[in-house]
Amino acid sequence: MTNALVTLIVLLVTGGAPAADSAVSPVNAQAMVEKLASLEKRAKLGKPPRKVPMSVSESELNSYLNLTRGSEMPKGLSDVMVRFEQDRLMARGMLDLDQLRGRAQPIEGLDGLLGFLSGKVPVEMTGRLRIVSEGVGAFAIDDARLATVPVPVTVIEQLVVWATTSAESPKGFDIHSPFRLPYALRRVRLEPGRALLD
């Protein structure tokens, strides 16, 4: 799974309780690994698009993120749970605010919250994934909260850049920029409880 897709999923964190299908298990994590391997193989071989979309359940994605890719999550983010609704993606996670302290550049708009919060707090977001053109997606945040306190989108932008900056991506991930879907996918459709990958 590419960093862009992992980042996109991690970005979308919301306050609703995860659905029952969101349970994390090694079996579901392995199912997701196998689906991603199939997509990757198909893309490398340049095969035509699938006739039937691949379905990914919330449980498969949550299991994969937490059990298989947990160590690769952005700095300070853990326990990510994703929920799919019609054309919307929601997620919730825990953010270690102590890892934000001592940054060379403070995150504007977060200073006040950091003054009275510490340790791990819930971070929640909801947003919409839209397909800009075949194979290209974009994300729009509808709501973001840190420890149940609404935070401006600009704070989330800065958190995402901070969390995704690496040697291969020195500027981090810009949540407003369109991005190429991984595995030569043409589109992703979100429905209650699942994502359909074409």
Give names to the regions the model predicted.
Residues 15-198:
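Extracellular/lumenal and peripheral-membrane lipid-interaction modules
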Residues 3-15:
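Bacterial N-terminal signal peptides
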